[in-house]
């Protein structure tokens, strides 16, 4: 996908906020006005905020840092999973487990158990179990896959969070804040921007708008990784050539 422009955001309805009676006054500086009792987000703020966030993410990924994609509500869940996977980044797209960051040691236990079940499934151990045991093990594996499957390869705490709907994911943001992990978040007119280091003012309910944000983040992650890989190849080739010359 090419760089996001104003037309993309307009077509996706990124400028449509919530009903005026549900607004959060802390978002007033990002609001252009109201139409039919719906707040209109000023995309003149959204586009540069998105680009600033993308620049930060690209720089972090180029340094081999991990960006945790978080979007657990129905409109965001599938998109977050698909784009995070494409980006090669961890994700949480079902319920956020309390302590997922602040009590990561406990989460590691769940990840270890998931890996054990995956290994059992692959090495034929399931075939030696009774039907009831297979059913119970499969259910456990499915449950763990939903809750920690997206972070099983994270290896440790993430370096930043990319969040869709900051009110819905407030527990995740609070945990990140406690640990000093920067938060990049899509913030709608009814939401509280507190605790979000990089605010992207925009509609967080429209599937098309969520797709644009997540796709843009994934794109810069992929680009940063590709650039890092090509730089590594160039350095390696240069070193080999210098060694051959000697």
From Swiss-Prot:
InterPro entries: Ribosomal_uS2 (IPR001865), Ribosomal_uS2_bac/mit/plastid (IPR005706), Ribosomal_uS2_CS (IPR018130), Ribosomal_uS2_flav_dom_sf (IPR023591). GO terms for cellular component: cytosolic small ribosomal subunit. SUPFAM superfamilies: Ribosomal protein S2. CDD domains: RPS2 (cd01425). GO terms for biological process: translation. PROSITE patterns: RIBOSOMAL_S2_1, RIBOSOMAL_S2_2. Keywords: Ribonucleoprotein, Ribosomal protein. One of its GO terms (molecular function) is structural constituent of ribosome. It comes from the Bacteria. It holds the Pfam family Ribosomal_S2. Belongs to the universal ribosomal protein uS2 family. NCBIfam families: rpsB_bact (TIGR01011). This is Small ribosomal subunit protein uS2. It comes from Chromohalobacter salexigens (strain ATCC BAA-138 / DSM 3043 / CIP 106854 / NCIMB 13768 / 1H11).
